[in-house]
Amino acid sequence: MQQGDQTVLSLRPGGGRGNRLFGSSSSSSSLSFGSLSSSDLPLLRPHGGAPASSFPFKGGDSRFDGRERVKYTREQLLELKETTQLSDEILRVQRETAAELFGEEGTWARGESVVSNLVPVQSASRFSEPDSRDWRSRSTQPPPSGEERSWDNLREAKDSRYVEASQYNRQDQPNSQFSRANISSNQGGGPAPVLVKAEVPWSARRGNLSENDRVLKTVKGILNKLTPEKYDLLKGQLIESGITSADILKGVITLIFDKAVLEPTFCPMYAKLCSDINDQLPTFPPAEPGDKEITFKRVLLNICQEAFEGASQLREELRQMSAPDQEAERNDKEKLLKLKTLGNIRLIGELLKQKMVPEKIVHHIVQELLGADEKVCPAEENVEAICHFFKTIGKQLDGNVKSKRINDVYFKRLQALSKNPQLELRLRFMVQNIIDMRSNGWVPRREEMKARTITEIHTEAEKNLGLRPGATANMRRGMVSSGGPVSPGPVYPGGRPGAGGLMPGMPGTRRMPGMPGVDNDNWEVPRTRSMSRRDGPGPLHSPAVSKSASMNTRLLPQGSSGIMSGKTSALLQGSGSVSRPVTVSAERPAQSVAPLTVPVPVEKPQPSGPKLSEEVLQRKTKSLLEEYFNVRLLGEALQCVEELGLPSYHPEFVKEAISLSLEKSPPVVEPIATLLEYLLSKKVVAPKDLETGFLLYGAMLDDIGIDLPKAPNNFGEIVGKLILAGGVDFKLVREIIGKMEDDRFQKMVVDAAVRIVESSEQGKSLLASQAADIEACRNL
């Protein structure tokens, strides 16, 4: 090599210049880029990428133009390798390049020797050695043809090689982990982070449960499915779940107790379950010699006792949580504690009914709740608990002569508490309600909600709606009559959805204007001009065959076929009156039928049947009022009341009408006052009937006002409207408030009546003429 020659030494294979990757573009270079054919390119491109024309190489470097190149053979380069010490920076760049070309896993498996000899060794081996590999056994697909090569294909091939290398390295896990640690530390420039283990690492417990856990898991699943309908089936499964030791027994009882106290409505069912299990499970030996045997009953009572006695301590702990940031947590825990306490009280009462708890324990609980000192007012939570306790077991205790005498002592104390000003007004009303309940033979004013089977629910629905027995079962099966099935699905009024969700003719059903009518055999009757304004298909005179109104009404409420057969009343078919024959038409659009005269059968007058019972009258009253509240048609309501056919029942009707209207949410004061005015003007209801009905309702207002605080005010408004109508006067108001004991309710009734009367010009003169009676009302 001469000094004068301006040559550039290059260590690149082929003596390339500048920033050329594979060689120069000179034609004299044996390994230059221009001298390679397209078939040779894949040997220098392991990934089988695009042809050379697609690579954005620069044509050359102007700094070395016109200078002679020095070419080195493979042997010369290998000699240079043995005597040359590469810096760490160059080695790092080589590793990164190899990782890009062959994948990281391939780099980790090959080691540094492969990286350092990457280009020369690979090219030499591919040129000198024949390809004897078994290409058919390859797991990955061969690279696509030149037309199909793309970056997506390259990425997929790289990913497949990465997965293959990972599977290979997993066979030697320690070496693989070691090599990964080295590579990551070298690439990142520092030691790999230490793996932090969790204190309680996750572990798959499925299939590794102990016998106790398996039984408790089974019992918990059974309790979650337990309902009155499935009680017998699931009770047997629970008994046979594998309760074979005392520890399992205690766990099962704890699950039942926790479930019962959080679901007080189902406490009767859980108490019965405890009684049945206690009778069928065996006893277990004690943990220590000399102790009593472990039985279901003993363990259950111990759990109930611990929960009852520990409630006070838990309340004290909650009172100490006074920090502002603990307020939300304290409120949640107080609600949960109250729910569990009342649920425990309810469960103990139901266990008494099943004879699982002796009466002496019940008396001990009552005495603990009331306290030993009669001059000290018990805690509010204790007063509420004692009310719930007597509501559950009061009738049971009064059934025993000895317990009844003790009950008298308890209720004297409760009588004093009902007037104790230290007690919250809500709790005083609650205590008074229990006292009234006892005086009424332990019959609650309102039916208590309890768990029922589906059959019981259907029976009650049939009773309330006046359906024949078994009708709701047919509805569920999609049957509208005993003779023919219909397509499955809900039964809609008029055979279409969106009409209130009730059956045709049921109280509350109202057809929209313009809807075609439907008769009782589910024939659709197109609306014509001759139909009634009230959307009821009246007598029609159309060129069609008429059919009588003797239709299938067995599944409709008693008296509800009026809407379907042209009658507008909900009581026409069940009140004993003679039904009028009505004809409806079924037009056939495809045929033209000449007018026909069909004789209408005339029913013979039947002798009036026996008088309806009070229960039937109340049911019919409720039905017609519900229908009136929905459709607000005074004429229909008038016809319904007339068809009751019992004027002596009219005072009771007035009372029921007021009661039902004020129990609505919101109360329907204006509609019921309008109805009573209308009945009075039509002389269907006499003024004496109104007075008696008002007095009957006023006598109950003290009790009603506890549950409906606005009832006295709303009742006063109804009375005021009837005073303006001339049906009653303020002398009646004086009699009404004379039957009331609560002075606050008395004032609300008088003020509301006066306010309504003085709102009109006519009322001002009435107030002046009855000023003495008004003053007497205010002085009561």
UniProtKB/Swiss-Prot annotation:
Residues 19-45 have a biased composition (Low complexity). Disruption phenotype: Displays resistance to potyvirus (PPV or LMV) infection. I4g1/i4g2 double mutants show reduced germination rates, slow growth rates, moderate chlorosis, late flowering, impaired fertility and reduced long term seed viability. They also exhibit altered responses to dehydration, salinity, and heat stress. The i4g1 and i4g2 double mutant has reduced amounts of chlorophyll a and b. One of its GO terms (molecular function) is translation initiation factor activity. Pfam families: MA3, MIF4G. GO terms for cellular component: cytoplasm; nucleus; plastid. Residues 1-68, 125-154, 166-194, 529-549 are annotated as: Disordered. PROSITE patterns: MI. Keywords: Initiation factor, Protein biosynthesis, Translation regulation. Residues 166-186 have a biased composition (Polar residues). Residues 216-440 form the MIF4G domain. Residues 616-738 form the MI domain. The keyword Protein biosynthesis applies. GO terms for biological process: regulation of translation. InterPro entries: ARM-type_fold (IPR016024), Initiation_fac_eIF4g_MI (IPR003891), MIF4G-like_typ-3 (IPR003890). Residues 128-137 have a biased composition (Basic and acidic residues). The keyword Protein biosynthesis applies. EIF4F is a multi-subunit complex, the composition of which varies with external and internal environmental conditions. It is composed of at least EIF4A, EIF4E and EIF4G. In higher plants two isoforms of EIF4F have been identified, named isoform EIF4F and isoform EIF(iso)4F. Isoform EIF4F has subunits p220 and p26, whereas isoform EIF(iso)4F has subunits p82 and p28. Plays a role in the accumulation of some potyvirus during viral infection. PANTHER family: EUKARYOTIC TRANSLATION INITIATION FACTOR 4 GAMMA, EUKARYOTIC TRANSLATION INITIATION FACTOR ISOFORM 4G-1. Belongs to the eukaryotic initiation factor 4G family. This is Eukaryotic translation initiation factor isoform 4G-1. The lineage of its organism: Eukaryota, Viridiplantae, Streptophyta, Embryophyta, Tracheophyta.
